[in-house]
Amino acid sequence: MNSTGRIPLWLVVTFGGIVVLTVLGIFIYGSYSGLGSSL
């Protein structure tokens, strides 16, 4: 595999994981805070 000039796969997976966990965390926090009930 030639990965020159491209973003490393591990970096994409790590960044994607952080984004997903952050979004899920905000959604769960909003649900417990009562903000999720208004959606």
Curated annotation (Swiss-Prot):
Signal peptide: none
Cell compartment(s), UniProt: Plastid, Chloroplast thylakoid membrane
Domain of life: Eukaryota
Entry keyword annotation includes Disulfide bond: no
Gene Ontology BP, a term: photosynthesis
Biological function: One of the components of the core complex of photosystem II (PSII). PSII is a light-driven water:plastoquinone oxidoreductase that uses light energy to abstract electrons from H(2)O, generating O(2) and a proton gradient subsequently used for ATP formation. It consists of a core antenna complex that captures photons, and an electron transfer chain that converts photonic excitation into a charge separation.
Name this polypeptide is given: Photosystem II reaction center protein J
Source organism per UniProt: Cyanidium caldarium
